[in-house]
């Protein structure tokens, strides 16, 4: 056997190997805030850099088929600690996108934050999807479903993909295939 494909993503961030962990996911913004304070002494830039460093290490060492929600660190931020349009943040995003392309990974476009009401955009965010398109990074659409009722939550994603210029997506059906954005 073996796996058909692997999705790689980071949910827990540490400051030092073996150290305390910052949980960036989950339903509670309070956990994000408390972890930021406890693990990184409230230094959001250091924390976000650690998130992207770990994401890049995962991509380079594991070479997953799909990189999942690599801007998830912004979910509970809600533009409170940093702006996702700030240059230092976008530089980290671009570095990760370059690595995704170099390693031949597919980038997931994930709708979960929207349909769960936890985020105001897709993962990655629209501005990042635009960059992905210009870099010609292959993309797959996912709901990141945790239960059957979440399987068809694709509202708005195909319209956005057409608007930003994506022409083709990839999907797995025993082998990797391409499809036109409809």
Where are the model-predicted features located?
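Extended substrate/RNA-proximal surfaces in nucleic-acid metabolism proteins
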Residues: 1-102
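Charged catalytic cores and adjacent phosphate/nucleic-acid-binding surfaces used
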Residues: 21, 80-182
């Amino acid at each position: 056997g073996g796996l058909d494909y692997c999705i790689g993503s980071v949910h827990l961030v540490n400051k030092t190997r073996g150290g305390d962990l910052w949980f960036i996911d989950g339903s509670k913004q309070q956990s994000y805030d408390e972890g930021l304070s406890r693990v990184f002494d409230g230094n959001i830039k250091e924390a976000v850099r650690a998130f992207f460093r770990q994401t890049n290490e995962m991509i380079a060492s594991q070479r997953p088929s799909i990189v999942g929600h690599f801007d998830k660190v912004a979910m509970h931020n809600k533009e409170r600690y940093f702006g996702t349009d700030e240059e230092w943040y976008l530089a980290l995003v671009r570095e990760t996108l370059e690595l995704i392309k170099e390693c031949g990974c597919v980038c997931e476009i994930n709708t979960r934050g929207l349909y769960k009401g936890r985020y105001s955009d897709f993962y990655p965010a629209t501005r990042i999807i635009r960059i992905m398109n210009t870099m010609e990074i292959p993309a797959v659409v996912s709901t990141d479903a945790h239960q059957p009722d979440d399987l068809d939550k694709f509202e708005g994603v195909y319209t956005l993909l057409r608007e930003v210029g994506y022409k083709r997506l990839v999907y797995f059906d025993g082998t990797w295939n391409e499809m036109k954005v409809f």
